[in-house]
């Protein structure tokens, strides 16, 4: 049962800390270095994640990226108060610009070093499309996370709107997840019948501010809902997150 609690917030935290956007890749020879700090919570778990990442466009059609997050979490379970910290699921990604507005992506997620992380390797892949207007960008995407069936195997799709104003961008994103969780064998050999719901969604809103020609600050908030996250039997509420990311553009 406690594994179920952990994986609900792990899934939310992993998605919330995907730092890169859904618009076309950067120009050849350019890139970004990112440093992020955020707070995620889903009772009875809460904590802070710090992450460092980099992405670089080696070619006009190829972008390479990496993200390494560290988690500092605490939770209360069966009368015990536990603190955990360590490496969460590191991510390595490739993105291919196949035509104007269309790109393919493949990401690999490595196992983490603490209990609050996915404990198996997972691969994520999909298609992105974006329309660029004078002051509005509209992005759409569809993808599939291929990992352990009980924790992180699902289809997802979503859309993002970015509105460009003077020296800053306001954006909003909606992501829908669809996938079936399987019954899981708990520790001690007992079969758990807590087959979870299949659907969930994530809603995020944020602002990107150009501090200088090379520094951009991104402040965001995310909320998760649906039976993939919420579970009344386990007394799980809706997860939420707040974060701030500083980008160095080169």
Q: Where do the PLM segments sit?
A:
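Residues on the lipid-exposed face of transmembrane beta-strands in outer-membrane beta-barrel proteins
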Residues: 37, 52-56, 92-96, 123-131, ...
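Predominantly the C-terminal beta-signal and adjacent terminal strand-loop region
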Residues: 176, 180-250
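Transmembrane beta-strands of outer-membrane beta-barrel pores
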Residues: 37-43, 68-74, 108-114, 121, ...
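Hydrophobic alpha-helical segments and helix pairs
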Residues: 81-128
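Short glycine/proline- and aromatic-enriched beta-strand/turn motifs that initiate or cap beta-hairpins
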Residues: 17-73, 249
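Flexible, solvent-exposed loop segments that connect beta-strands
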Residues: 39-43, 72-85, 114-116, 146-150, ...
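Repeated loop/turn-to-beta-strand initiation elements of outer-membrane beta-barrel proteins
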Residues: 60-66, 100-106, 132-141, 167-172, ...
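Residues that define the transmembrane beta-barrel architecture of outer-membrane proteins
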Residues: 46-50, 84-90, 117-123, 151-157, ...
